[in-house]
Amino acid sequence: MGPVHRIFSSFARARRNGARWAPFQIADKPSPSGGFLFFNGVMLKTPMPTQHELEMVTLEELVPKDHLLRQIDAAVDFEFIRAKVAHLYCADNGRPALDPVVMFKLLFIGYLFGVRSERQLMREVQVNVAYRWFARFRLTDKVPDASTFSQNRRRRFTDTTVYQEIFDEIVRQAIKRGLVDGRVLYTDSTHLKANANKGKFDVVKLEQTPAAYTEALNAAVDADRAAHGRKPLDRDDDEPPSSKDTKLSRTDPDSGYMVRDDKPKGFFYLDHRTVDAKHAIITDTHVTPASVHDSQPYLDRLDRQRERFEFKVEAVGLDAGYFTPAVCQGLEERGIAGVMGYRTPNHKPGMFYKRQFKYDAYRNEYVCPQGQALPYSTTNRLGYREYKSNAQICGRCPVRSQCTNSAIAVKVVTRHVWERAKERVDARRLTEWGQRIYARRKQTVERSFADAKQLHGHRYARMRGLRKVAEQCLLAAAAQNIKKIAMLLARKRKKGPAGPDWRFVRMLLRLVSGLRCSFDYPLAANPQS
């Protein structure tokens, strides 16, 4: 019978005998390490203060063998950081600086364990032996001042690409370990609440930045108009760009005011993140104000990954926010199969749906539900072909009220010059292959964001300004990658359920059940490619 069980048995025996709680008694001869209490014959030990005793101990003994930081230290090489930042330090002048490897290790500790402020991080390092072990501090070493991070950020790393380079090198280490293959990528965005009061703003006119695909769209519009015998559109390069009224935060002007369905209103940033399908390693993160649409930076960031990491991308999984003509066309031009979600378009009750107007590609016209043709009229600057009905026929139509409210009785149906690419992407979504690809989104990029928000402080922007928030997102993503690399490699080293034999059994089960992972399917299996 154990000591705890004996204690509770004594309590029960005393209650059965009709006794209330019996008083504790101090033993006559306490040991040097503490006194003794007796209750119904059971001895309880009371500890004596031992804080000032000397012990022979090492940090290596105090850190558990299965601690996350031990796994990270064994799996990830941080020495590259010193070479990345060497040109930013003076070798023969000034006081000795904090080792940059140690500094970034401390920052990674903060993101790994959700420590929100650098001041609190230093308090944690002061008392946590695992943190000291990881940073190579002795028990009696003085930890750096919290201002060390802010001063390096402000004086040394401003206007540099150090954070991006460190993130990229972590990804390269994952590639070398075989944890990333770059065949199937998933991209999404999440919002971070800016460190700004949503009630303090000015309404200003901001110029609209031309989209990255503007030149390609203009060329497609001119080619389409020429094919239909129309003149090219006049474009005045000296014409000032369009502008619109926008809420500008007084506290953090770099943030953007977000107005989206089912999203909070206020000043936010967007973290556009891409993960690899194999093990959900983050391969890219890019920060914009929340007023920027998800699709705008997508193709540029995709090209950057293909160039930087030499990815041979075969397919991408995206949500409905990326289902735009420009993205669909861009993916086709790059030979990448896109699988995207579908969003029901806005529809006025009582009116015909656009899908009820059938497109006749041979005659290049639409046919209305009443069987009347809407021939091609023109192609506008936004890249949309306009198909217009005959006003005389529509004026006598019995269902005109369900078709158009036009005062001149003309129904206009639009079709983008890149609409065919959208239709192929949408058809791919409905195939069995496309459904398997899309189903993996929730296990990859959505799970990555969930972990970031729940465990790594990704709900709020810690600092103000686009550059500093980008630093936060890069370090948080790098910390998540470091953690995943370490855990995956530790799992491979460990024998048992995660060993090779069990993986083989799981693969057989997937083959039998038809639940094989999406990245196991080559592009040739895609019937729509």
Regions found by a protein language model. Give the residues of each.
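Hydrophobic alpha-helical membrane-insertion signals
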Residues: 41-70
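Anion-binding and metal-coordination hotspots
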Residues: 39-40, 45-46, 114-127, 137-529
